[in-house]
A protein has these predicted regions:
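Glycine-rich beta-alpha junction loops
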Residues: 8, 47-50, 70-73, 105-109
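Short pre-catalytic strand/loop immediately N-terminal to key active-site residues, enriched for Gly-Thr
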Residues: 64-78
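Conserved phosphate/ATP/ADP-binding segment of small-molecule kinases
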Residues: 1-64
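Gly/Ser/Thr-rich helix-start
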Residues: 47, 79-81, 126
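Short, small-residue alpha-helix embedded
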Residues: 11, 74-97, 101
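Short active-site-adjacent structural elements
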Residues: 51-54, 75-76, 109-117
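Short, charged, surface-exposed loops that flank catalytic or proteolytic processing sites
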Residues: 17-26, 92-102
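Charged C-terminal helix
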Residues: 98-135
Length: 135
């Protein structure tokens, strides 16, 4: 499994971030190139458009999906770590990949909304402890 944001995916593949095609065909091409390096399950995280954030879920030889959620506040340190940890834990528990990703997105949506209310400095990450029992 690999869960890069777009910047990380571009660096891995030596692509110019500013020239990347973000259409579904472009995202499939990025994920297939990453998959050729080993991982069969990939999520390109944090694709922003307006008030939404998208995660592109790719699983080799399966139908891909673009999952959206609301953008809450500014960027936060550590969200990718929390995301990949929840997905990994859900996979270990036997959930399928798309369900695991949706579980992580739902958890982060709640935790980020709570963090926005608490207003800690951005580099403190997210206040996820409030929702740990839900995962």
């Amino acid at each position: 499994m690999l869960t890069p944001n777009l910047t990380e995916a571009c660096r891995i593949l030596d692509l110019d971030y500013h020239k990347v095609d973000l259409s579904e065909e472009g995202l499939v091409a990025i994920c297939e190139a990453l998959s050729d390096m080993g991982p069969s399950r990939i999520v390109i995280t944090g694709l922003q458009q307006g008030d939404l954030i998208f995660n592109y879920i790719f699983e080799k030889n399966k139908t891909s999906e673009l999952l959206s959620t609301r953008k809450i506040g500014g960027d936060r340190s550590g969200t990718g770590d929390v995301f990949s940890s929840i997905v990994t834990g859900a996979l270990i528990q036997g959930q399928d990949f798309k369900t695991a990703v949706k579980r992580a997105v739902t958890f982060l949506d709640k935790a980020i909304a709570y963090t926005a209310q608490m207003e800690p400095p951005w580099n403190y990450g997210i206040c996820f402890e409030e929702y740990l029992e839900e995962i």
